[in-house]
């Protein structure tokens, strides 16, 4: 590869690093071209899957300000530059790796830090953003309905009590005017028993 071509390739890869929301790094030793094409299709717009020379990728990562990945760039390395949801891309790669043992997840990079294999797999095990938002909305809707019921309950209870009291008074008939209370006569104080 000519020096100018290498510089262009490094600039292109660096730009992909900068634009990606996450990168997932894999080893593809033993996969066929057909397997790689199948993996690219399974990513379906969530990421672009690229194979490049490790030296060029290291330089591009350095230019993009990404650190901590150099040890992952050994052997036949391919990178998924995630532009959509990291969960979707990680899930697709993990599923493909289960079906094709030749694909090995080496790690990744997201939110300014390197990811271990375990962290990439945990991301893959998460539910997608849409599912999580739907669950949150469902939980909020249920809680709002309960809150509305709680706020309406006291008012309806007071209304039922008022109606019951009104019916009871109507059944008793007209009430007599209250009589003024009479005070009992004051008692005379007792004389002391010692007086003689």
Curated annotation (Swiss-Prot):
Keywords: Ribonucleoprotein, Ribosomal protein, RNA-binding, rRNA-binding. One of its GO terms (molecular function) is large ribosomal subunit rRNA binding. GO terms for cellular component: large ribosomal subunit. InterPro entries: Ribosomal_uL10, Ribosomal_uL10-like_sf, Ribosomal_uL10_bac, Ribosomal_uL10_bac_type, Ribosomal_uL10_CS_bac. GO terms for biological process: translation. Residues 167-196 are annotated as: Disordered. Gene3D superfamilies: 3.30.70.1730, 6.10.250.290. Part of the ribosomal stalk of the 50S ribosomal subunit. The N-terminus interacts with L11 and the large rRNA to form the base of the stalk. The C-terminus forms an elongated spine to which L12 dimers bind in a sequential fashion forming a multimeric L10(L12)X complex. Forms part of the ribosomal stalk, playing a central role in the interaction of the ribosome with GTP-bound translation factors. Belongs to the universal ribosomal protein uL10 family. This is Large ribosomal subunit protein uL10.
């Amino acid at each position: 590869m000519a020096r100018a071509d290498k510089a262009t390739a490094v600039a292109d890869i660096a730009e992909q690093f900068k634009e990606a929301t996450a990168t997932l790094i894999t080893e593809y030793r033993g996969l066929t071209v057909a397997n790689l094409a199948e993996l690219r299709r399974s990513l379906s717009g969530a990421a672009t899957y690229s194979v490049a020379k490790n030296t060029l990728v290291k330089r591009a990562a350095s230019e993009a300000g990404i650190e901590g990945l150099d040890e992952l760039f050994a052997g036949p390395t391919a990178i998924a530059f995630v532009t959509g949801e990291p969960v979707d891309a990680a899930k697709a790669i993990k599923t493909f790796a289960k079906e094709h043992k030749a694909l090995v997840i080496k790690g990744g990079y997201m939110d300014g830090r390197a990811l271990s294999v375990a962290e990439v797999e945990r991301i893959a095990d998460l539910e997608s953003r849409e599912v999580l938002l739907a669950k949150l909305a469902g939980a909020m809707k249920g809680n709002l309905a309960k809150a509305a019921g709680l706020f309406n309950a006291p008012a309806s209870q007071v209304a039922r009590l008022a109606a019951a009291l009104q019916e009871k008074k109507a059944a008793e008939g007209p009430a007599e005017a209250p009589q003024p209370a009479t005070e009992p006569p004051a008692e005379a104080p007792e004389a002391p028993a010692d007086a003689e």
